[in-house]
Amino acid sequence: MDDKKNAPSSDKSKALAAALAQIEKQFGKGSVMRMEDGAVVEEVQVVSTGSLGLDLALGVGGLPRGRVVEIYGPESSGKTTLTLQTIAEMQKLGGTCAFIDAEHALDVTYAQKLGINLSELLISQPDTGEQALEICDALVRSGGVDLIVIDSVAALTPRAEIEGDMGDSLPGLQARLMSQALRKLTGSINRTNTLVIFINQIRMKIGVMFGNPETTTGGNALKFYASVRLDIRRTGSIKSGDEVIGNETKVKVVKNKIAPPFKEAHFEILYGEGTSREGEILDLGSDAKIVEKSGAWYSYNGERIGQGKDNARNYLKERPELAREIENKVRASLGVPELGAIKSDEPVAKKASAKESKEAKELKEVE
């Protein structure tokens, strides 16, 4: 009886092995693999956003490489600042970055203040949406670019709209453009381990009585293809006396395919400086009991580092090694890995398995 039961199973194994042999012959080795062989499942490589609180809210310590990310929010909420900081962090790891400026509004002086090496940054100011997405596709396929930012989806104007008259009605043209581009881009992005960030704007749906009337531009394709979607909002102002020197900012992770979603991060964006990273380290460090706070004094390892948040922040700014040490302890306490250097990014499909797979043995038997 047992032999009869095992016979169909053996036939199925041989049929599967033959099918796998045909697939590998037609599409190349690694087209289909078992998950347990370790050739597919890998630790997600990430790059910091420049905000410790947001890195922690993302669950893996930053934005994932080899994925599409969407950052959206109202005007002057910090979208471009966040992406420029991410570029600066990627450059610190030795990565190559590109900025596709469809809005033709990049402030290079501000980018430099945020720590970006302009001589190493690739920049494009395309004339049409098709041109912008073709440039993005070419850069991704090259495998030589680690991070691409497109600013913004709303500015990706289809060629037909530019060449037409002002009053022409062209419904759904931009949505179709985005849908086609993302279908083409997604596979290449994953193979080359490139992080692609789309900045998007908010529009209001007309006639919505119940629910959220807000929506993003460019149709629904980006919502589906994005592994991470961040909703960034300005919640208040930071003042020094009567002068406004920055914004209080809230970011909600509204979609996350690599960690639990719906977490929030609160941080400060200072004008001309970007995210107050030292301020975040103090706040999150005191929450994790790594930095001691007694009255107005902040202390670390029994040594006082400043009276009042401003003094403590300046102390850490002058001592980046100490700030990094505290940040790594905060990350470790919450189970988020430290950010390391970029590894060699050979396409996943071509990486050899550590052990010979079961399919390989079966294929030998078939042959």
Curated annotation (Swiss-Prot):
Cited Pfam families: RecA (PF00154), RecA_C (PF21096)
Subcellular localization, as worded in the UniProt entry: Cytoplasm
Keyword Nucleus assigned: no
Superkingdom, taxonomy of origin: Bacteria
Positions with a binding annotation for ATP: G73, P74, E75, S76, S77, G78, K79, T80
GO annotation terms (biological process): DNA recombination; DNA repair; SOS response
Region (Disordered): 345-367
Principal location: cytoplasm
CDD domains xrefs: RecA
GO cellular component: cytosol
Keywords in alphabetical order: ATP-binding, Cytoplasm, DNA damage, DNA recombination, DNA repair, DNA-binding, Nucleotide-binding, SOS response
GO molecular function: ATP binding; ATP hydrolysis activity; ATP-dependent DNA damage sensor activity; damaged DNA binding; single-stranded DNA binding
InterPro entries xrefs: AAA+_ATPase, DNA_recomb/repair_RecA, DNA_recomb/repair_RecA_CS, P-loop_NTPase, RecA-like_C, RecA-like_N, RecA_ATP-bd, RecA_C_sf
UniProt family annotation: Belongs to the RecA family.
Protein task: Can catalyze the hydrolysis of ATP in the presence of single-stranded DNA, the ATP-dependent uptake of single-stranded DNA by duplex DNA, and the ATP-dependent hybridization of homologous single-stranded DNAs. It interacts with LexA causing its activation and leading to its autocatalytic cleavage.
Protein name as it appears in the record: Protein RecA
Species the sequence originates in: Herminiimonas arsenicoxydans
